[in-house]
Design a protein with these regions (language model features):
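Short, charged N-terminal beta->alpha structural module
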Residues: 274-295
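Active-site neighborhood of phospho(di)ester-bond hydrolases with catalytic His/Asp-centered motifs
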Residues: 65-67, 89-97, 116-121, 177-180, ...
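Active-site metal-binding motif and surrounding structural segment of the metallo-beta-lactamase
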Residues: 60, 71-118
């Protein structure tokens, strides 16, 4: 069989195209990097990979907003080079100190000794100096602006979304908000825009990102959202976050999700039943609790911690009114995975007022595990109308029926 000939340099051309910049608007480009195989970030699973977004503005002053994780220097530089020689960059804006955003500041600075670097003051200046030494940073605050030619960029500090140095950059000329961590998702895709991807999956990843990264700072996130709204109803038609896809067709959807679901603390009538089990007894109790919710007309999800990562639990937890956490007793303590969940949950500081908790579990000679779960849930602010639900050794069918009925009555009465 005769092989079809390929154009000379075909593979090189394809690779060059893959590592080319993506135009967002005239003279504004995405030049970031894709970490396809990343599966963990700060303790939570990133099954869809990670995108480190950086943005290039071609104006009288060539401006780069954020960089990428240091190991992606070549990818970043190749994408920039598809538009302009990286040594021609005049201004670098660091919206966030964290190394997945700032890791290539030394790379860019090394190419241009006259580079001007702007970041938040004082936290950004302190953080970047600690990481990379004194590169002559220019600290900016909310209300400060920077003229780069026909564009004037405005800065708004968004502290603790999710570090003290965070800020966003607004390009009024193009109506683009470079939002840094706000409105982001850990989601690697060859398609850059929201409308080029499965919107349901993008929104799911945005929710998971909020639940596991931004949730402890929901009041700060709400303030950042308010600042965006204050720009005016027609001021932003594109949101370019530091991770994930760029919002252009569904800007209103992600703003509404942050406002009405993520930061509001509004709870839905749904339940999650999370547990670990040693020999199956606590698992049987978990199923009875789940059945009790279903009998009361409450949607419920059963989550065995052997098969579900704690970061996925927190995604479902975000707006669940009912949370059941179960563990047998192991060495007078809850099972390690349950203890890890409770520790992780405590760190994310969810708003638990109005949330109903059901601590439960089996035991042999002392119910120390379930009682420890109950204590931690009570300290976290859960209401515990059933106190702690326990069963010694293997629960009988009669005991399982009692548990199911108790949960049904409780959920039906609320």
């Amino acid at each position: 069989m005769r092989r079809r000939s390929r154009p000379a340099g075909g593979r090189a051309n394809r690779e060059a195209e893959i590592l080319s910049a993506v135009q967002l608007k005239p003279d504004v480009y995405w030049v970031g990097a894709l970490d396809w195989n990343a599966r963990e970030f700060h303790g939570y699973t990133t099954e869809a990979g990670i995108t480190y977004n950086a943005y290039l503005i071609m104006d009288e002053k060539v401006t780069l907003i954020d960089t990428a994780k240091s190991i992606f220097a070549d990818e970043l530089l190749q994408r920039i080079s598809s538009v302009v020689d990286p040594s021609k960059i005049d201004i670098l804006i660091a919206n966030h100190v964290e190394p997945d955003h700032s890791g290539n500041i030394p790379t860019i600075a090394g190419l241009n000794p006259d580079l001007q670097i702007y970041c938040s003051a004082p936290a950004g200046v302190k953080g970047l100096t600690a990481h990379y030494g004194d590169l002559g940073y220019h600290g900016v605050k909310t209300g400060d602006t920077l003229c780069v030619g026909k564009r004037t960029l405005a800065f708004v500090q968004t502290p603790f979304v999710h570090w003290p140095d965070n800020m966003v950059t607004y390009d009024a000329e193009d109506k683009i908000l470079f939002s840094n961590d706000a409105f982001g998702q850990h989601f690697a895709s060859s398609a850059r825009f929201d409308d080029e991807n499965d919107l349901a999956e993008v929104m799911r990843q945005a929710r998971k990102y909020y639940a596991n990264i931004v949730q402890p700072y929901r009041l700060k996130a709400a303030a950042a959202l308010k600042a965006v709204r204050a720009l005016g109803p027609d001021a932003v038609d594109m949101i370019a976050p530091a991770h994930g896809v760029v919002w252009r067709s569904h800007v209103a959807d992600i703003l509404d999700a942050y406002e009405k679901t993520f930061t509001s603390g509004a709870l839905q009538d749904k339940a999650i039943v999370v547990y670990d089990s040693m020999w199956g007894s606590t698992a049987k109790m978990a199923r009875s609790i789940c059945d009790g919710f279903l009998a009361a007309g409450i949607p419920a999800r059963l989550m065995d911690l052997k098969d579900n990562h704690i970061s996925d639990v927190m995604d479902d937890f975000l707006d669940a009114r009912y949370v059941a956490v179960g563990s047998p007793t192991l060495n007078s303590q809850p099972m390690p995975q349950v203890a890890a969940l409770l520790c992780y949950m405590r760190g994310l500081s969810p708003k638990n007022a109005g949330r109903t908790g059901i601590p439960f579990g089996s035991y042999g000679w002392a119910p120390a595990g379930p009682k420890a779960v109950a204590q931690q849930m009570e300290e976290a602010g859960f209401e515990l109308p059933l106190d702690v639900v326990t069963s010694q050794w293997i629960p009988s069918q009669e005991r399982l029926d009692e548990i199911r009925e108790a949960v049904r009555k409780m959920a039906s009465a609320e």
